Regions:
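"A position-specific structural signal for the A-helix of alpha-solenoid helical repeats
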Residues: 3, 42, 49, 86, ...
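Short coil/turn linking the two alpha-helices of tandem helical-hairpin repeats
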Residues: 3-12, 49-58, 90-99, 132-134, ...
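Structural signature of tandem alpha-helical TPR/SEL1-like repeats
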Residues: 10-24, 54-71, 97-111, 134-142
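Canonical positions in the second alpha-helix
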Residues: 29, 72-73, 111-112, 145-146
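Terminal, low-structured helical/coil segments at or just beyond the last alpha-helical repeat
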Residues: 132, 136-175
Length: 175
């Protein structure tokens, strides 16, 4: 669902449909296994991607539900690195006036990297946060580490999303 929406869908309508299906599958998984952290994570990722595709400001009504899903996921399994990626991206994407926080996002990304230093989505997120904070040298170091990663946790995400974004950020204008 979220993978289909990220990789195969070519229009926003297709992405929204894929993420909606993913949300529904996640909701059913939670009903069947309410103590399963991956079920909560799957629901949260699809909800976040749906909101991101629709537009962050147009999707603020989902924020409290998404934060609760993240909390439940981390309560169930605080070692799940992908949950920290989700939490960090939410705090990065949501404007501060609506509850987002670059400092909190940085903390989530760093905690996730402490659990899995090869999770390139976490490192990319950290690089984006540092860049937005004006910490350009640190950001470039993290973004180069994404490109230099020899054993990414998720090679598909690394090759289709993380490395291309890191390359773009490194070659683009500085903030």
């Amino acid at each position: 669902c979220f993978i289909w929406g990220d990789v195969r869908a070519t229009t926003d309508e297709e992405k929204l449909a894929a993420y909606s299906q993913g949300r529904e599958a996640g909701r059913r998984a939670i009903e069947l296994a309410p103590r399963n952290a991956l079920a909560h994570l799957f629901y949260g990722i699809n909800t976040g991607r749906w909101g991101q595709t629709r537009g962050v400001l147009r999707s603020l009504f989902l924020l409290s539900e998404l934060r609760e899903t993240i909390r439940q996921t981390l309560d169930l399994d605080p070692t799940l690195a992908a949950a920290y990626a989700l939490a960090g991206n939410v705090d990065y994407e949501v404007p501060a006036m609506f509850g987002g926080s670059l400092e909190r996002a940085e903390g989530y990304f760093r905690r996730g990297l402490g659990l899995d230093p090869h999770f390139t989505a976490l490192r990319l997120g950290l690089g984006k946060v540092l860049r937005k904070q004006g910490r350009v040298a640190e950001a470039q170091q993290e973004l180069r580490a994404v490109l230099d990663e020899a054993a990414p946790t998720n090679p598909a995400e690394w090759s289709t999303r993380d490395a291309p974004q890191a390359r773009t950020l490194l070659s683009g204008p500085r903030p």
